[in-house]
């Protein structure tokens, strides 16, 4: 979001804000109840967020709170890639200068929570509204540990199957929403054969997070897991389900771009937006970029829940339940951050601006926002209503992630797994080294066992 747009956004009429809050019964929680004494604190409140305009929108809302309640404070966003958060936080804690608020993806949030580095936020849940969550989710999906909530929802963001429907119709392919893995494989093969200048399908295969996330969805759809949450996170990776998921990736590889073994987030988006693939796994950013750079591709692309596994019928995505967490140590602004966060989380106008800042990538987490008529005041609701609904709502029934595999239990080891690229390396053993999937599964299981043994303290 540009500086001008943020400035304009900060000049909301107070009557509009109050009207929106009154409609959801949240005026008191947002700080419009009995007057409170202003904070006399001064300084800069450091807020970490991953690259993206939505962090800036949230901070603009917090600065609106500060203007009224803590005029000596200024909230400032610092963009930090999520996989750099843990190392930088350890460095900043050692220097006694941590950020005061962090928006981060769920795997690292779960690790910080289990490490005891965060402030509990159970009382904020009550102020924000415990019963506001959209259907199909629970507060603990964002982060609860040993009976306490540590993470406040920012958004959820699933990766889905993106399909060029113009190509699908031209080649007589069936409805992608009805596909299973065999149908997806056949569609990728058909496109590659009949469109020699275009890959049939694209996912990341490089040694990076994107590959981790893409493969995890296939692993979970097959019924496989890294760890068994019900058995104190014993390693469960050396399984027929892991072998099946790895085999499927190997079968898809001939119909992917030749450089896919190096691909990460950017390259997958590039391949789709530039017309070098007809299908891809990705989050909503692809559509946002296509709308700006490649209108015909944007108009032709629709998002679908993932192809079903032929046996389990599961169609899991990797859904990041991204949230806000408050570092507990050497944080001089805990009280002010808590108040500002409640203000942002209970202000309908700001929450809608947050979602609109990167459509349809950051999905609303509260029912009153998801159902608000104002949310539909965005061009994508006219041009891509079914796709937006899939990202925002129907994907939730198929949510999974490495931080909460099959939603069976928060995993404090996931961030460490991603830090070592265990899943991506396992995939590369198959697609680059031509290792048998069975042997690759055993290799990955050993790596996961090492992680569990070295970090057993996190399991309590």
Task: State each model region's role.
Residues 31, 145-154, 159, 183-234, ...:
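Extracytoplasmic/periplasmic solute-binding protein
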Residues 106-160, 182, 211-214, 300-306, ...:
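Hinge/lid segment of periplasmic solute-binding proteins
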Residues 119-135, 177, 205, 222-244, ...:
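Short, solvent-exposed loop/beta-turn-alpha elements that line the ligand-binding surface or hinge
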Residues 187-190, 230-261, 302, 306:
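Glycine-centered hinge/linker elements that transmit conformational signals in sensory
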Residues 285-297, 310-421, 459-460:
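C-terminal lobe and pocket-closing loops
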